[in-house]
Amino acid sequence: MREKLIFDLSRNGRKGYSLSKNDLPETSVAAVIPSKFLRTTPAELPEVPESEVVRHFIRLSNLNYHVDKNMYPLGSCTMKYNPKVNDYTCDLPGFSTLHPLQPSETTQGALRLMYELSSMLSEIAGMAAVSLQPAAGAHGELTGILLIKKYHEAQGKMRNKLLVVDSAHGTNPASAAIAGYEIISVRSNADGRTDLEDLKARLQSDVAALMLTNPNTIGLFEKDILAIERMVHENGSLLYMDGANMNALLGITRPGDMGFDVVHYNLHKTFSAPHGGGGPGSGPIGVSARLAGYLPVPVIEKEESATGTSYRLNYDRPESIGRMISFYGNFSVLVRAYTYIRMLGPEGLRRVSENAIINANYLLSLLLERYDLPYPKSVMHEFCLSGDRQKKANGVKTLDMAKRLLDYGFHAPTIYFPLIVSEALMIEPTETETKETLERFAEAMIAIADEAENNPALVKSAPETTPVKRLDEAQASRQLNICCSL
């Protein structure tokens, strides 16, 4: 039975709260709040007893899907299990009760954590300096591109074009466009990697940078990255790495060693903070030495004196691009990432990436016979299948198979991305899934391939067992109409 809205459970006078007796003199609200800020009618808040509120949200949580329930194979999203110790440290009163406007001498523990996290991220990626300000991956992209723009302006060179590989996340060209750049697409070659000849042809004197994801969005390492780095830098351009797929690189190789000038980290992905549904995220950026002076303010600095070690916020950075967020970043995510890194250490981080690569290749080997693979078989942490075979045979599309997977108790993978793969199914199992879970997922995918051949109508009408059947998603996105008056 479909769950009612909390407003539909409301009954007049059925209130689930009580307030302590007021021991202060009664004061009229109108006497302390200007009339323009006062409501003219009571708020239409639901009146529901506590027991029904709890049951309502428990029922909703049972309908929800999350990584603590089962495998969440969204490609390029790194939906790994999030250790609960991260939440424990995040909830420590010394962190959870802070206010960002407190004097820095009263927030030394938080500043130390942020300083040390910056240092660890610098070491992990091989970058000279890090800013923790960006609130998400795309925000990190924009920050990095603004740094690149500032660099070229300081050189007296007004470059107005930015190259983006055609397999890139859509946020790459969007971030560059927001920064005022003209976007030029670079083709992928037959192996799914950057086409060096096409890159060479597009590297002109007005190109500010190349944005690249490594490994790319079909899970392939850019084996020509050193040649790409030489080509870009010889042109006077800079090299930007989208760090969405950093989960494949930890302790194995570093973007800085490949010659990248800017990289953004997705702490909510690689470094294990719960994400999805809008956040919270965290997208710090690491930069090479030539860009360090342009980082957003304030920069956290460590000071040694006769009285000991202290940390301060330095706003005196005349070349800085300024603030990128109201305060200092999404602190709760920073605490979780710090905990994750300290718990694992260098060897543990390397095992994360090794196991992520092993899991992806094992799962791919189980699915190869039933689904098309448009590019080479050896992948990093994720892979991209094509549903062309099923679509051509019986008209069963990737969307249909993704919907049918819900009936088998799994979240669907990323579909129709990257755009260079027809009927794309992008799957990232992450390192935290067991061999048995991978095999159960493969069994479901193989069963769906069988159904696509023998009972295509079933797959086309899926899902059948979910609380809500297939929605008209196009209409929902184009005619969004949420009605809830308060």
Swiss-Prot record:
Keywords: Oxidoreductase, Pyridoxal phosphate. One of its GO terms (biological process) is glycine decarboxylation via glycine cleavage system. GO terms for cellular component: cytosol; glycine cleavage complex. Its EC number is 1.4.4.2. The modification N6-(pyridoxal phosphate)lysine is found at K269. It holds the Pfam family Aminotran_5. InterPro entries: Aminotrans_V_dom, GcvPB, GDC-P_C, GDC_P, PyrdxlP-dep_Trfase, PyrdxlP-dep_Trfase_major, PyrdxlP-dep_Trfase_small. It catalyses: N(6)-[(R)-lipoyl]-L-lysyl-[glycine-cleavage complex H protein] + glycine + H(+) = N(6)-[(R)-S(8)-aminomethyldihydrolipoyl]-L-lysyl-[glycine-cleavage complex H protein] + CO2. Its cofactor is pyridoxal 5'-phosphate. One of its GO terms (molecular function) is glycine binding. The glycine cleavage system is composed of four proteins: P, T, L and H. In this organism, the P 'protein' is a heterodimer of two subunits. Belongs to the GcvP family. C-terminal subunit subfamily. PANTHER family: GLYCINE DEHYDROGENASE (DECARBOXYLATING), MITOCHONDRIAL (PTHR11773:SF1), GLYCINE DEHYDROGENASE, DECARBOXYLATING (PTHR11773). The glycine cleavage system catalyzes the degradation of glycine. The P protein binds the alpha-amino group of glycine through its pyridoxal phosphate cofactor; CO(2) is released and the remaining methylamine moiety is then transferred to the lipoamide cofactor of the H protein. HAMAP family: GcvPB. This is Probable glycine dehydrogenase (decarboxylating) subunit 2. It comes from Chlorobium phaeobacteroides (strain DSM 266 / SMG 266 / 2430).
